């Protein structure tokens, strides 16, 4: 087997106003997990998109199985045994699991797609690697964790020797994340190499064989779990000492700001997802909602934010009954929402940073007057957000 499965050699990649990768070199060996660690904006996703053929490097080389290659697109990478599970899944929601997995590489029989053969192969792969899934389920009906399994099976179906995973646990429950890490370790026992992109320190120390840390597009450290610690990794990521354990004083909650009484909410199929739910949230406290995905969490969030109306029950915000309130009414009361799928439900990708920054308030002063948007005010607001929260963008108009 090749000594180096995948490597970047002195890769540099620029975008307008941003040096995303600056002379970056990494190497992945067979049967090992290489963790690519860094803050948001460190250049991790750009680097793996170069390795997968989605971007062409401005300088430097990509090496696959000891051969320097010129990738013209993902097809080139896939044909050379590189698979990738993107942070935002590349699936066709109305199609079945098996159809998504074999799409573009369908088995045929007498000139027709042989779905029976495809289904058998998918079942065999899913059982072998502990990725059990219904091959005939519609992807749009699957929770996010199951959709990720579809993406992994897509790569395995194409006989990947390398699996690149971009922030794979960001959408998973802790139990699902633990299961995934076990699956990845099992995959490496077959000789497969894995590039694991994350900013979660505990996962890196638990699963990685080798660790590369990126900061501001540059490699600032290479190590192994036995040679470092959470504190050491955090310091490499941000360039300064980091306090990982914060002493918190006891909560001193104030008035009730959200009250839910006997709430009943149906899911997309009309089945009861929440049944007689009761709770209160007071000012100054954090309420955690735990549970395996698909047990009503999404329906609860959508009911609170006005995206889904309860069939029974009452919801009060600051003492005002808003059970059937619209998203605009609820937002006006000070309720903010960061959705599970930020790309699909949180932003408008074709809009600029400035335009996205006022999506839920464009109709209010000072951003508009008598229905006319005030572009200068919007840009100024967006720049304030970028400065305050360290948003990594060349400017607010992209």
Question: Over which residues does each language-model region extend?
Answer:
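Glycine-rich phosphate-binding loops of nucleotide-dependent enzymes
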Residues: 2-398
């Amino acid at each position: 087997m090749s000594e180096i499965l995948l490597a970047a050699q002195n890769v540099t990649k620029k975008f307008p106003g941003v040096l995303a990768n600056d002379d970056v070199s990494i190497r992945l060996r067979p049967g090992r997990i290489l963790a690519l660690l860094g803050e948001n904006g460190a250049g991790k996703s750009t680097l793996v998109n170069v390795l997968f053929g989605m971007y062409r490097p401005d300088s430097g080389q990509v090496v696959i199985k000891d051969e320097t290659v010129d990738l013209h697109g993902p097809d080139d990478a896939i044909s050379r045994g590189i698979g990738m599970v993107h942070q935002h899944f590349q699936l066709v929601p109305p199609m079945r699991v098996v159809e998504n997995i074999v799409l573009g590489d369908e088995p045929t029989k007498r000139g027709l797609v042989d779905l029976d053969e495809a289904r058998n192969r998918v079942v065999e792969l899913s059982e072998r690697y502990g990725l059990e899934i219904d091959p005939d389920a519609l992807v749009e009906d699957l929770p996010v964790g199951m959709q990720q399994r579809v993406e992994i099976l897509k790569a395995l179906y194409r006989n990947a020797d390398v699996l690149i995973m971009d922030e794979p646990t960001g959408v998973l429950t802790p139990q699902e994340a633990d299961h995934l890490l076990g699956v990845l370790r099992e995959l490496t026992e077959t000789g497969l190499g894995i590039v694991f992109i994350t900013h979660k320190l505990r996962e890196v120390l638990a699963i990685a064989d080798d660790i590369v840390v990126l900061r501001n597009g540059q490699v600032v450290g290479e190590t192994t779990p036995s040679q470092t610690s959470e504190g050491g990794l955090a310091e490499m990521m941000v360039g300064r000492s980091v306090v990982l354990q914060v002493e918190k004083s006891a909560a001193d909650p104030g008035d009730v700001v959200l009250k839910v009484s006997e709430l009943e909410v149906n899911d997309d199929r009309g089945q009861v997802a929440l049944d007689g739910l009761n709770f209160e949230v007071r000012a100054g406290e954090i309420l955690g909602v735990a549970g395996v995905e698909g047990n009503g969490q999404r329906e609860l969030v959508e009911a609170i934010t006005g995206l889904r109306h309860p069939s029974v029950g009452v919801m009060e915000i600051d003492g005002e009954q808003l059970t059937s309130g619209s998203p605009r009414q609820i937002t006006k009361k000070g309720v903010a929402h960061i959705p599970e799928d930020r790309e699909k439900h949180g932003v408008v990708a074709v809009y600029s940073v400035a335009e996205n920054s006022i999506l839920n308030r464009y109709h209010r002063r000072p951003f508009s007057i008598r229905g006319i948007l005030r572009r200068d005010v919007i840009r100024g607001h967006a720049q304030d957000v970028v400065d305050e929260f360290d948003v990594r963008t060349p400017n607010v108009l992209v």
